[in-house]
Amino acid sequence: EAMCHLRQNKNDHYIGITLIDKNNNNVPGWKKSNLFLENNANVFIETAADRTGNLMSLDNLKYCQKKYKQSMDMVTADGGFDFSIDFNHQEAVSSKLILCQIIFAIAVQKKHGNFLIKFFDTFTTASIDMLYLLSLLYEDVYFVKPNSSRYANSEKYVVCKNFRMDNSEELINKFYPVFNNHSVNVNISEIFTMRTPYLFINKIEEINAIYG
């Protein structure tokens, strides 16, 4: 919505996808965006294969991979859960969703495209592995803490610029097992079997010291 407002370019095309559950009032879906959607005909809502917009569905990944393969100049990912009763474990709980968002982004990202994704704490092996993966796939990776984000809030944004890959299909196929277990309660402990370079881990520790 912000990018659409700033660019004011009717030739742009925006695709939005989020979880839709009409039986759960805690899932906002697009209820608060009706006016925005009415006023911007170049914004399209994607519900994917199962019509729920669930990013943890393998069928939905395959659907979006086929439909939008290597077509997106800019991808943003701002998904999350309600952590109001369990702030201390939001990094672990969100790990699978964050990884799924990264996989979706890789599946649709155009070469030289950019990706913006929200992380929370970045202390666990899983988080460091995901950041290392992004550093391999994009030319430049930056951490950003917006002025509007409270200091006590662990959220931070990772800006990834200049996607390196011409074709990501083979890589995406290797991530299919991540989607085999549909439970959001199954957390990701690590991604790589190899050891992440110590220099990279050291840089993440420095960033954690700055942002907390």
Where are the predicted features?
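Beta-strand cores of modular interaction/reader domains in eukaryotic scaffold and signaling proteins
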Residues: H13-I15, T76, L116-K118, Y142, ...
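The AdoMet/dcAdoMet-binding core of the Class I SAM-like
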Residues: E1-F83, N88-C100, F123
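Anionic group-transfer/hydrolysis microenvironments
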Residues: G80, F120, F163
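Short, ordered loop/turn segments at secondary-structure junctions
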Residues: L19, F120-D121, P146-N147
